[in-house]
Amino acid sequence: MSETTDVTKASQESLKYTIAQLGYSGLRVNNGIISEEIKRELQFPQSILTYKQMGYDSTVASALNYYEHMMLKSDMKVKPHPEATEQEKEYATFFQECLEDMEDQSWQDFIQEVSSMNKYGFCVNEIILRKRLESKGSKFNDGKIGIRKLPIRSQDSISKWEYDEEQNLVGLTQTVAKMGKRGKVLLSSKGEEIFIPRNKFLLFRLGKVKDSPVGESPLKACYYAWKYKVAVEEQESCGIHRDLSEIGRAHV
């Protein structure tokens, strides 16, 4: 006996496709602070101090220095494609000129600053442009817009990340402590807050879990081993001190 199936025409409402964004990555952001870590010591911005302390360890420092050295060994040259047009060749030449025409900053200096992401998980460098004029300190005098410098914005100076209603990163807030005489930091002052829009800085990061701007530091996986090592060393030093204090002295 044959079976029959009723087929009804789909409504126009069910055929509509929404092109707008509905969900988001799920990144936990509370008042500009990324709140993904369970351990407070590994949560930004406290993590910056933690990783800085870990960087004093000889084993950790050796690994970080090795990665920095390998990054500095890389040679950066902009070469056009063999089948590039004349205009594309001009673009490549112009970009190479910009990298070699930065003020008080070489390409190696820039890479060395970027290598700090190996410790902290991310690195922010502000984009500062200028007209290529000799009066502005440039090697060229064609009036084109070139790169003045790409200075780092230190990780411990970034206080929060700014997001819009659709959870898109729109910038960051940097807190710069006010300095007194002879470079002394005025601890009683809250410092000055500076907003840097997203199109004004480069963001380098290791890992993009939930598209987090702070990335994921390689030192995170070493944290418990490092903490245990520090605790054992402190216990050993206390034991050695006690043993030495019990050595008697004889006077003749």
Which residue stretches match the model-derived regions?
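Active-site acidic/histidine clusters and adjacent loop/turn architecture
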Residues: M71-V78, E83
